[in-house]
A protein has these predicted regions:
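Alpha-helical transmembrane segments and their membrane-interface boundaries
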Residues: 1-49, 133-136, 140, 147-167
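Hydrophobic alpha-helical transmembrane segments in multi-pass integral membrane proteins
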Residues: 69-79, 122-136
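Transmembrane alpha-helical segments of multi-pass membrane transport proteins and ion-pumping complexes
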Residues: 15-27, 61, 65-73, 90-102, ...
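Membrane-interfacial segments
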Residues: 29-30, 75-79, 83, 104-108, ...
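Alpha-helical membrane segments and adjacent membrane-interface helices in multi-pass membrane proteins
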Residues: 35-73
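Pore- and pathway-forming membrane helices of multi-pass small-molecule/ion transporters and channels
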Residues: 16, 31-48, 94-95, 102-131
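Cytoplasmic-side transmembrane-helix entry/capping segments in multi-pass membrane proteins
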Residues: 54-63, 84-88, 107-116
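Structural signature of hydrophobic alpha-helical transmembrane segments
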Residues: 23-37, 75, 79-91
Length: 167
């Protein structure tokens, strides 16, 4: 079998097997935003599931999650008009994320921070800020599941399958 098809079919099997397990089990551990894992796994896959990047990507996603909570609270507290508030919040916090991320570039992957922020805002933005409850923690758990379970474990599983097939 050609290398291309070995990679494609083992990846197809890995994608068919592992993410659905997360999708089924995540609500049982209190995570109602399980699909976030797939988004985060997709970004991690763009880095070739490089395990050396797993920690900076994870920290970036978690920074984005925290950033979304802060932004949501800032936007609710603002007396400015909705459009001005959204613009200024995104302008200031986006710029700060890049500057802080650059200072911490060995620890935090900036694109993950920005993507995590967007994910968090998409989920929490429409919510009543007083009812966020465990939502930020659920988002963070799903982000980590995307990187570590779907990304790292998935990559190791696929490599194992390839090794078995090539024997």
């Amino acid at each position: 079998m050609k290398e291309k098809w070995i990679n494609a079919l083992t990846l197809a099997f890995t994608v068919a097997l592992l993410p659905p397990i997360w999708a089924v089990l995540s609500p049982y551990i209190g995570v109602t935003v399980g699909a976030v894992a797939l988004i985060c796994a997709g970004l991690f896959a763009c880095l070739n599931n490089d395990i050396k990047m797993a920690v900076p990507v994870s920290l970036g996603f978690l920074c984005g999650d925290i950033w979304a909570v802060i932004a949501t609270n800032v936007m609710v507290a603002s007396n400015l008009g909705a459009n001005v508030t959204v613009y200024l919040t995104l302008f200031i916090m986006g710029g700060l994320a890049v500057v802080i991320g650059t200072l911490l570039d060995k620890l935090v992957f900036i694109p993950a921070w920005l993507a995590g922020w967007a994910i968090g805002l998409t989920i929490m933005g429409p919510m009543d800020v007083t009812n966020l409850g465990t939502t930020p923690f659920q988002i963070g758990a799903a982000m980590l599941a995307g990187v570590w379970y779907v990304g790292v474990v998935g990559d190791l599983f696929q490599k194992l399958l390839i090794k078995i097939i090539k024997k």
